[in-house]
Amino acid sequence: MPLERLNFLGLRNLAALDMRPGPGINLITGANGSGKTSLLEGMHVLGMARSFRTQKLKHAIAHDADAVTLHGRVAGDPPVALGVRRARDASELEIRLDGERGVRVARLAEALPLQLINPDAFRLLEGSPAARREFLDWGVFHVKHEFFEAWRRVRRALKHRNALLRHDRIDARSMRVWEQELAHWSELLDALRSEYMAQFAKAFEDTLHELLPLSGLSLRYYRGWDKQRGLLEVLEGGRDTDRQMGFTQQGPQRADLRLRIGKRAAVEELSRGQQKLVVSALKLAQGRLLDELTGRTCVYLIDDLPAELDVTHRRIFCHWLERLRCQVFITSVEREALANAWQSETDVAMFHVEHGRLLTE
């Protein structure tokens, strides 16, 4: 469901903002430093309760403000009201959903599925496994209802086992309890991830073919421990080495997506431009699969697309966005860079940011 209204106050260099975006393509232009990326950042915080620019949201509060306050309304029957506030002197976020306080971040994410494509996202292939796990789990979360509970239980059990590993003397009974808990929920989490990947692989292959036909590229899911052994057996056998390290070395927290060309990692074979196209295909395929499996669309936040893709691939990428029929926010320094990227029948809402002020064109 698209965002139909946004109200931001106290966000970086942006003036108080009241935006009514279009349900489809929204092009936001402006000079570097004008506030375009801050606008995307505000939407990201609304859906994820965190910024993609800073680990501490208080750093996004305008210098002359005591808090950053973000409100959004997601279209629907009925519409859904989202709210996130972070005061400079507060230790935690205040999150609201339809006026209800104390809402979990998972409920925000469920109400507003977001896909971010920015320079950091384009480094997905060469970055840490944690980024690829987050990418994978975004997809599983939105199509598998059991995922969040399994993920939460795994994190809890893992925390307890790691704490026990760091004790001078291990309580064998407690260790056994938490290893059984960790193994049970990890096996479920692995099954959900595996099921999703079986569906995602085809969507990715089809999308990539139009962006960058590559022979021999394979996408594989690695679950984080020996596929021939149950996790409980692995945990029991690895206690001594885990204790030496002070943490659990195998399990779903070590899962990864591996892209290869032949026997080599794809990142070692592909040019920087090719890597960007592969990541573009990954992101587009997730939105496509979400629509196919649930009938819901995600909102794409795309920062400075003209700087990341050449003209030809930019046009193909934009045509994919049109086919997905989702809401898109794209920033660009120059309007002309994306003027011819769309089909004539596509409605494009135009906005301009100038010295922190949003103007409708």
From Swiss-Prot:
Gene3D superfamilies: P-loop containing nucleotide triphosphate hydrolases, RecF/RecN/SMC, N-terminal domain. The RecF protein is involved in DNA metabolism; it is required for DNA replication and normal SOS inducibility. RecF binds preferentially to single-stranded, linear DNA. It also seems to bind ATP. ATP binds at residues 30-37. Keywords: ATP-binding, Cytoplasm, DNA damage, DNA repair, DNA replication, DNA-binding, Nucleotide-binding, SOS response. It comes from the Bacteria. It is found in: Cytoplasm. GO terms for molecular function: ATP binding; single-stranded DNA binding. HAMAP family: RecF (MF_00365). Belongs to the RecF family. The keyword Signal does not apply. This is DNA replication and repair protein RecF.
